[in-house]
UniProtKB/Swiss-Prot annotation:
The keyword Ribonucleoprotein applies. This is Large ribosomal subunit protein uL11. It comes from the Bacteria. One or more lysine residues are methylated. Forms part of the ribosomal stalk which helps the ribosome interact with GTP-bound translation factors. Belongs to the universal ribosomal protein uL11 family. Signal peptide: none annotated. NCBIfam families: L11_bact. Part of the ribosomal stalk of the 50S ribosomal subunit. Interacts with L10 and the large rRNA to form the base of the stalk. L10 forms an elongated spine to which L12 dimers bind in a sequential fashion forming a multimeric L10(L12)X complex. Keywords: Methylation, Ribonucleoprotein, Ribosomal protein, RNA-binding, rRNA-binding. The keyword Ribosomal protein applies.
Length: 142
């Protein structure tokens, strides 16, 4: 018989840097989960990732206080800022450009994010990436 799911918890944790301090510890602790068990398992799975890359994680909490977690790909903004070599997006997107991206960079980001996006083709994923880039004040060069 399958375990009864009591809830889900979504967190964004830096790769290889999960520790019991806030915000991870209190979020897991108030749900009665073993904080150190999660931290060790998460850090072990993110060893191959670049340090401090933000990794979205969805934790499934069961009635017996056990859990499983699923890691997603890093946020699109992280990839866009890395590709454009900027620290943050434009304060006034649409007016001031924070940087530029090439179509090849957009395609590369779309292929990385494809499994987490709600689309079937790379072209559809590319249009989502371009929309996110525009909202950050990045221009896409042909």
């Amino acid at each position: 018989m399958a375990k009864k799911v009591t809830g889900y918890l979504k967190l964004q944790v830096p790769a290889g840097a999960a520790n019991p301090s806030p915000p991870i510890g209190p979020a897991l602790g108030q749900r009665g989960l073993n904080i150190m068990e999660f931290c060790k398992a998460f850090n072990a799975q993110t060893q191959k990732e670049e340090k401090n890359t933000p990794i979205p994680v969805v934790i499934t909490i069961y009635a017996d206080r056990s859990f499983t977690f699923e890691m997603k790909t890093p946020p699109m903004a992280y990839f866009l800022k890395q590709a454009a070599k900027i620290q943050s997006g434009s304060k006034t997107p649409g007016r001031d450009a924070a940087g530029t991206l090439t179509r090849a960079q957009v395609r590369e980001i779309a292929e990385k994010k494809m499994k987490d996006l709600n689309c079937d083709t790379v072209e559809a994923a590319m249009s989502m990436v371009e929309g996110s880039a525009r909202s950050m004040g990045l221009q896409v060069a042909e």
